[in-house]
Amino acid sequence: MYQNHKNEILLATPLIKDDIVFTKSVVYLCQNDRHGAMGLIINKPLADTLKDVFEELHIPHTNTFKEILEYPLYMGGPISPHKIMILHTTNGRNYTSTIKLDEGLAITASIDILEDIANNILPEYFLPVVGYSCWTANQLTDEIKSNDWIVTNKLNKKILFNHENKVKWQNHLEHAGYTLQSLDTLFNRNTGNC
């Protein structure tokens, strides 16, 4: 039976292994309905930074805060890997291409938000991602039933937007009430250093 998980977090379980994209992934679900789901992986930083994006798009950034220039881009998923989007808290600004989500979040795919960021006009929280993840109708439901994903509706913006990516999966897991030991028990095998 279909269940809407929009605005929830997917945590890859140890059953997803040897998958370069989804192993130990934390996915924020932006959209989920009977036709499918769309989400962004939020814990897989790439080598490219916002400075690289500003230079490629010829966005002036001489006055941009250094820490903003060093923000990594995140691999949002395998679909459209060259499309940049900003997952962010709403800040009262109206951008050309914004989809408002729940919990005061939005996703914007237009250059005007990048220009604002380059000018240090920042949302409270934001995460630049390239690409996205997609599931067809019933695909995500089937993967959840197969225990590939733990779903949590315990959204915490500080954890969601935190740049400590090596522990983001575990932090979300713990925030959802799980431990590495409980995963061992749940999956009846040793997950090692998940």
Swiss-Prot record:
Gene Ontology CC terms: cytosol
InterPro entries (alphabetical): AlgH-like
SUPFAM superfamilies: VC0467-like
One Pfam family named in its UniProt record: DUF179
Family that this chain belongs to: Belongs to the UPF0301 (AlgH) family.
PANTHER family: UNCHARACTERIZED PROTEIN YQGE (PTHR30327), UPF0301 PROTEIN YQGE (PTHR30327:SF1)
Name this polypeptide is given: UPF0301 protein FTM_0963
Native organism: Francisella tularensis subsp. mediasiatica (strain FSC147)
Lineage: Bacteria, Pseudomonadati, Pseudomonadota, Gammaproteobacteria, Thiotrichales
